[in-house]
């Protein structure tokens, strides 16, 4: 089976490697154009491009696939490359470009998407972050037959995965990437045998995982302690939960719900203690112990190391975000 692969970040690279390892012929990879990244803002190729080129797979990087859009020459060149590839199917994973109908219609078996949620819950751009943030007990991967809607196509395979109390977006991402890679291999093997059975998504339970914005990073200490703990885990590694204390912004990377109680009249954001064990902060209904922190321009550090270079003390107050 000939497979065109469309994807950009590490989540997609894992699936591409799984398909290649399973012996599928991959004549073409589509990925986003190189972007400036890092402190030097040098152009950097996507994880998918780097892997594809290291395995001598042809790569196309159109800025758009819309023939009537802003970059019609890119779309036309991509169309020619897709036609020349004569693929049976296109696999899409976190690609980042909208696929017009002509793309969906071109492969014999259409386009299959690897989506990191249990559809129809968390359609959209940030399903892993939002599942943790919402306190979902489980998530998973859906292999979907793509249509013109936003993650609305028929479901082909679904696998569930429990969200652990310590999972961050980073750890859950890696688990779901591995699961998605295994599932897309299984889906294509079933497709080759004519054994895939599409199931329509239910109309009930639809939610949207809107893109994570940097403006969401700030911790609201008036919220319940469990909600703040989930927020920190959901914002790790991007954009990183943040707290303001005076003129300093501190990133919060790891936390635990403390067993200490918090009187209802205690000021929210008040530092109750700061020692090698962690920084305990009063929250809406309890106490959060922050165990890994980072100052602006510094490194992520365990609380003990962080406090050697940043003077946090009991009685200080983290700012509350503007309403």
UniProtKB/Swiss-Prot annotation:
The keyword Transferase applies. It comes from Polaromonas naphthalenivorans (strain CJ2). Keywords: Protein biosynthesis, Transferase. (6S)-5,6,7,8-tetrahydrofolate binds at residues 117-120. It catalyses: L-methionyl-tRNA(fMet) + (6R)-10-formyltetrahydrofolate = N-formyl-L-methionyl-tRNA(fMet) + (6S)-5,6,7,8-tetrahydrofolate + H(+). It holds the Pfam family Formyl_trans_N. This is Methionyl-tRNA formyltransferase. Belongs to the Fmt family. HAMAP family: Formyl_trans (MF_00182). SUPFAM superfamilies: FMT C-terminal domain-like, Formyltransferase. InterPro entries: Fmt (IPR005794), Formyl_trans_C (IPR005793), Formyl_transf_N (IPR002376), Formyl_transf_N_sf (IPR036477), Formyl_transferase-like_C_sf (IPR011034), GART_AS (IPR001555), Met-tRNA-FMT_C (IPR044135), Met-tRNA-FMT_N (IPR041711). One of its GO terms (cellular component) is cytosol. Its EC number is 2.1.2.9.
